[in-house]
Amino acid sequence: MSFDIAKYPTLALVDSTQELRLLPKESLPKLCDELRRYLLDSVSRSSGHFASGLGTVELTVALHYVYNTPFDQLIWDVGHQAYPHKILTGRRDKIGTIRQKGGLHPFPWRGESEYDVLSVGHSSTSISAGIGIAVAAEKEGKNRRTVCVIGDGAITAGMAFEAMNHAGDIRPDMLVVLNDNEMSISENVGALNNHLAQLLSGKLYSSLREGGKKVFSGVPPIKELLKRTEEHIKGMVVPGTLFEELGFNYIGPVDGHDVLGLITTLKNMRDLKGPQFLHIMTKKGRGYEPAEKDPITFHAVPKFDPSSGCLPKSSGGLPSYSKIFGDWLCETAAKDNKLMAITPAMREGSGMVEFSRKFPDRYFDVAIAEQHAVTFAAGLAIGGYKPVVAIYSTFLQRAYDQVLHDVAIQKLPVLFAIDRAGIVGADGQTHQGAFDLSYLRCIPEMVIMTPSDENECRQMLYTGYHYNDGPSAVRYPRGNAVGVELTPLEKLPIGKGIVKRRGEKLAILNFGTLMPEAAKVAESLNATLVDMRFVKPLDEALILEMAASHEALVTVEENAIMGGAGSGVNEVLMAHRKPVPVLNIGLPDFFIPQGTQEEMRAELSLDAAGMEAKIKAWLA
């Protein structure tokens, strides 16, 4: 989209943060209004993360106005809220390409801009990285400042508290800004509290605070009295005692939509020594009423008409795999009161909304705490219950030791419903489900299933749920199912594949939902087609049968080739000294960038045409 200077006259003056800092303070509220309108205009045309960015407009302007970015280093946690940051840092005219193939990255990305200090996408990493960056800056000796912005969801994760505990110990000069849009303590936001925050962040209070401690530090009772008195005075109006105990100087909560007030407070805090903590209150979706009323729905949006206030409804076609899972979960829970379902803050995405409403006492959203989610499931299994952990492939990576140490070693019957496996599309490198088969396949006692359609997905969930000899996993992709008939649930024989088509010379061993593409290739090449179904245990007898009756084998999976299902087939053949040629088709050895699922599959030769061309070239 072309930039309309007449519509955004103040924003037109800002092509960099240096130009932003030349603006008079009085013009900044107008800049915020234009920035918010431009965000609405651009994201509604292109799609993308939306409500979070609307809530951080004033904070973004204030941070870049007060701090000398990019020399001073600004770190955004997760990055959903960083669209205004991208607009103000030289990427305004490209914001319409965000999340598209070849366009701006959906999150802050080091390779895209010098303003993006840390590449992000997963949550709760900012403070840990910020401490390292602050320590490096201190050793550099150039008075470079470090700021981390983290949301109220991300700060609940253990990694964030581990980092804050460390910061309190080594005391680097850094600022952590908590962007709190839950409104849980909104009654504390007002003129009095904003005034208090500016007072507490000012030089006079800081000098008195530190000076008083030095004077009386030799008198233990008085030192303790001063400490407790300060806590009680601040505790009457602020909820920051926890952060103070971790070693931070806590300021807030303050109004995160008062850009001039934020600038005053940030200027006061900029040169304070040691770890500082600023708590701001914002409203997700600020300035666009539909998003304010329903920030979850407007968190990430398709293209839509902003004048209507409504997002386009789905076409009502085939159900998503997430819905298939959610329906199975409800169906099973209605028959078995031992079922317990766990999600790390992904209720909507994992298809668990209906379950959470029907079975609230058996639904556990543990927040952004993947490690805890898995070990919590282990505890439920020890207690005789049947836990189902619904988790995205990319987020299960964060709980790998818990899967291994707390579940698999103890042979606990935990079912992992792994959503967003394979190529996920627009969120790019940080969110592709490229590695789960590789990192799970090497774990003893793990059963791993890859459905080729929605009916098989249901049967595998049922099979895993009733498998009591250890953990099991069913991995399925983002997107819609293929439209096959759903049959009554029954347990599948563990480790057994099925031949879908008999051909000559070539056998294609398919793992998962690339089956429709593999079927087209098999038909074109008159190849045998096998639905392997299980990655672990592999159907070794079927693999050896295919090797004995065909001149060559091809394995197909939407997972990294290295260590994936195809590697397992290779291992079986080598162990039995079968020298049959094997072509492994899957995800290559690099991080898959953003683009639609269709675009990326075509680029990576994972569509039917690409697979057939690759096989023909290999056979030639």
From Swiss-Prot:
EC primary class: transferase
Cofactor note: Binds 1 Mg(2+) ion per subunit.
Subunit structure: Homodimer.
Descriptive protein name: 1-deoxy-D-xylulose-5-phosphate synthase
Cofactor: Mg(2+); thiamine diphosphate
GO-annotated molecular function: 1-deoxy-D-xylulose-5-phosphate synthase activity; magnesium ion binding; thiamine pyrophosphate binding
GO biological process, one term: terpenoid biosynthetic process
Catalytic activity: D-glyceraldehyde 3-phosphate + pyruvate + H(+) = 1-deoxy-D-xylulose 5-phosphate + CO2
Annotated Mg(2+) binding sites: D152, N181
Native source species: Escherichia coli O17:K52:H18 (strain UMN026 / ExPEC)
